[in-house]
């Protein structure tokens, strides 16, 4: 479990927006500390926005999302919620304030129309390299990106890495990119992630709707 998506919410903070607190699975989660963190922000601002990775865990390795919220429906059946619901219930009980827990879940995977031009170009580049290498008879390898600087700007190219080096291996956010308090990321993460969201593609439309892709099944020869 890695917190790249949740950490990316910090990019908006560069412009005075974004969450007040960010919690990632790269650090151990502490519920009493979380409550105090929220109380501290709320006392100063009168509101608090928190971004949480679904993989956060306690020091003993147990996932916070595995906790049960002791809440029942009209029939007495236990209502099980996601991580946001669990944390929202905790804050509601501790602070007696209005709380809303929003589970992005699949929604964050349905926003391809919001992908940056950089993301689209690199995805195409990786797919092209994969097909070319497969046709060339190369296997047991995975396409990887190699970042660099070209003419003073971010640049990226593909390379092959042995599959055994990356299979079932998580690429976690370096601890040095997370602030000491464990409630956000620092400039090192921003410098890493910001180039990846550059560029706004001109998306084709049809009747003001995105022109949905319809792929043909063509066998490679």
Identify the residue ranges that each predicted region occupies.
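C-terminal non-catalytic interaction/assembly regions of soluble proteins
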Residues: 67-221
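Accessory alpha-helical/coil subdomains and C-terminal extensions
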Residues: 1-100
């Amino acid at each position: 479990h890695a917190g790249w998506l949740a950490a990316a919410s910090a990019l908006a903070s560069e412009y005075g927006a974004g969450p007040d607190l960010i919690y990632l699975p790269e650090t151990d989660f502490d519920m009493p500390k979380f409550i105090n963190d929220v109380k501290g922000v709320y006392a100063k601002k009168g509101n608090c926005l928190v971004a949480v990775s679904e993989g956060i865990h306690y020091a003993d390795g147990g996932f916070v999302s595995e906790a049960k919220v002791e809440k029942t429906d009209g029939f007495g059946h236990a209502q099980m919620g996601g991580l946001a619901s669990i944390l929202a219930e905790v804050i509601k009980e501790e602070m007696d304030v209005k709380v809303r827990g929003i589970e992005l879940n699949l929604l964050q995977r349905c926003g391809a129309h919001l992908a940056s031009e950089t993301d689209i170009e690199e995805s195409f580049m990786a797919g092209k390299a994969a097909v070319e290498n497969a046709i060339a008879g190369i296997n047991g390898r995975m396409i990887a990106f190699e970042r660099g600087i070209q003419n003073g700007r971010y640049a990226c190219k593909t390379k092959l890495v042995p599959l055994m080096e990356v299979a079932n291996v998580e690429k976690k956010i370096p601890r040095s990119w997370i602030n000491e308090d464990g409630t956000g990321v620092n400039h090192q993460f921003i410098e890493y992630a910001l180039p990846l969201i550059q560029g706004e593609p001109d998306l084709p439309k049809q009747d003001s709707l995105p022109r949905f892709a319809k792929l043909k099944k063509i066998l490679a020869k």
